Amino acid sequence: IERSPAKDRIHRVGYVTNAPELSAACDVFCMPSTKREGLARAIIEAMVYRVPPVVTDTGGSPELVVDGVSGIVVPPKDAQGIANAIEKLYRDDDLRLQMGVAARERIATAFRNEDTVLKTIALYKELVPNPD
């Protein structure tokens, strides 16, 4: 960070109790995972706060983020692709705002808690035979 030309704009905040406010104040969220992960809660939270995510095509990230609609998906270990995606959103306010709205809508419609519970119950019923 100290060698970065943007060091004055990089903030390490440590432990905080106002994470929602900090998340909502961000322009872009970036999760540059290189290996498989599930549905990252940090991505979901960013999307709920209308912060467009830049994620890599690993694990559950592409399931959450519709590339070019609710965020940007780049190949893993593609530092230049990540930088280009962040810069694209940084330079285009309208696109950033549009993707932020689409991100929140995606979480609100495709990943509702109620639907997840119903799908989980249906899966259990399918996997576990009925004793009757």
Model-derived features with residue positions:
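Active-site donor-binding acidic/aromatic loop of nucleotide-activated sugar
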Residues: 7-15, 22, 72-73
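Short alpha-helical segment that forms part of, or immediately flanks, the ligand-binding pocket
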Residues: 20, 38-48, 62-63, 69
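Acidic donor-binding loop of glycosyltransferase active sites
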Residues: 24-38, 51
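Short hydrophobic faces within alpha-helices
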Residues: 45-46, 54, 82
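Short hydrophobic beta-strand element within catalytic cores of glycosyltransferases
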Residues: 52-55, 65
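Conserved acidic donor-binding segment of nucleotide-sugar-dependent glycosyltransferases
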Residues: 67-68, 72-79, 88-93
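Conserved donor-nucleotide binding/catalytic region of nucleotide-linked donor-dependent transferases
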Residues: 88-105, 109, 130
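C-terminal alpha-helical cap of glycosyltransferases
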Residues: 113-132
